[in-house]
């Protein structure tokens, strides 16, 4: 009897970092609790991309929360997908929303939200927030736990 993971191509394999987000493959596994309302959180505290104009590096902490339906995002494929932005030029808003939309397309969750907490460039931090809609009633939704940027406090 299979586990529903036979199709995975990255987990358990030596896998090179994709050249770009477009080339990255997000894989999913079956949700073992499809009738249960629960939250999955991924935190990427060292996300990087490039400014599309200057080529300078941009850094963010991403917090991704989703309520799965039939599938879960396989975490190694997510790690590789996020890493593929390292040499990708895009503005903060584009990176954050593109990540969320790719996740929605990959696993069709009941609900998803993303917080992109970008570190200052030119003295201005940019925080980007997006969600698919209102959170399902009864979903335990903890605060994302990222304090607003305070500079020297």
Swiss-Prot record:
Assigned EC number: 1.7.1.13
Catalytic activity: 7-aminomethyl-7-carbaguanine + 2 NADP(+) = 7-cyano-7-deazaguanine + 2 NADPH + 3 H(+)
InterPro entries the record matches: GTP-CH-I_C/QueF (IPR043133), NADPH_dep_7-cyano-7-deazaG_red (IPR050084), QueF (IPR029500), QueF_type1 (IPR016856)
GO cellular component: cytoplasm
Catalytic center residues: 51, 58
GO terms for biological process, alphabetical: queuosine biosynthetic process; tRNA modification
MF terms (GO), sorted A to Z: preQ1 synthase activity
Localisation per UniProt entry: Cytoplasm
Chief location of this protein within or outside the cell: cytoplasm
The keyword Cytoplasm is assigned to this record: yes
Pathway: tRNA modification; tRNA-queuosine biosynthesis
Keywords: Cytoplasm, NADP, Oxidoreductase, Queuosine biosynthesis
Protein residues bound to substrate: 73-75, 92-93
Record-linked Pfam families: QueF
Cystine pairs: none
Functional summary from the UniProt entry: Catalyzes the NADPH-dependent reduction of 7-cyano-7-deazaguanine (preQ0) to 7-aminomethyl-7-deazaguanine (preQ1).
Family label: Belongs to the GTP cyclohydrolase I family. QueF type 1 subfamily.
Protein name as annotated: NADPH-dependent 7-cyano-7-deazaguanine reductase
């Amino acid at each position: 009897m299979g586990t529903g993971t036979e199709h995975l191509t990255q987990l358990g394999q030596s896998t090179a970092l994709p050249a770009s987000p477009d080339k990255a493959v997000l894989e999913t596994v079956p949700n073992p609790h499809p009738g249960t309302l629960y939250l999955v959180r991924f935190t990427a505290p060292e996300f990087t991309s490039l400014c599309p104009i200057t080529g300078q590096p941009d850094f963010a902490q991403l917090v991704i929360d989703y309520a799965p339906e039939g599938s879960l995002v396989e975490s190694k494929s997510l790690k590789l997908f996020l890493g593929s932005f390292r040499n990708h030029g895009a503005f903060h808003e584009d990176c954050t929303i593109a990540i969320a939309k790719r996740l929605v397309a990959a696993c069709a969750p009941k609900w998803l939200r993303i917080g992109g907490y970008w570190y200052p460039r030119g003295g201005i931090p940019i925080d980007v927030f997006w969600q698919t809609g209102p959170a399902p009633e009864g979903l335990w939704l903890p605060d994302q736990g990222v304090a607003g940027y305070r500079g020297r406090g």
